[in-house]
Amino acid sequence: SSAEGIMRKLVDEAGLEDAFEIDSAGILSYHQGELPDSRMRAHAARRGYNLVHRSRPVRTDDFFNFDLIIGMDDRNIDDLKDRAPSPNEYPKIRRMTDYCTQFTHADHVPDPYYGGADGFEHVLDLLEDASAGLLATCLAQDS
C-alpha cells in the first residue's frame, strides 16, 4: 500500500485521477484490514504521502479488473502467477522495479520492517522512482 499511496499522489498531481484505478493487495491475508506499518506511515508522511489503504488479499477478480498486477519481488511474481486464473493473465504481472529509471540496478523492493529508518527511506526512494517510471510508461502507451 506504500506503492499505492505514492502512485495515487503522482496521478493526482498530474490531474489524471479519473484515468487510473489504483489499488493494492497482499499475497497473504493475515494483515487483512490493517493499515500499513506505523513506521512506514510516518516516513511516508514526511514526504507528503497519506497511507490510509487497509490491507486486503489479492483476488481472482483483480486479474480481470486491472491492466497491470505489480509485485515487489520475484516471490511476489511467482505467487501472483499461482493466483492468476490462467496463464493468459501472466503478461499483466510485472515487477515494480522494472519501472525504475534511477535505481536501475534494483531487482526488488526489499521488506523494510526488520531494519532501521534507512530501510524505510530506501523503499520510499525505490517506490518513488518506480512509480514515476510506471506513470510515464502508462502515459506513453496511451498516447
Please annotate each region the language model reported:
Residues 1-66, 136-143:
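Conserved active-site segments centered on acidic
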Residues 29-34, 62, 72, 85, ...:
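Acidic pyrophosphate-coordinating catalytic loop
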Residues 68, 74-143:
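Phosphate-binding/catalytic loops
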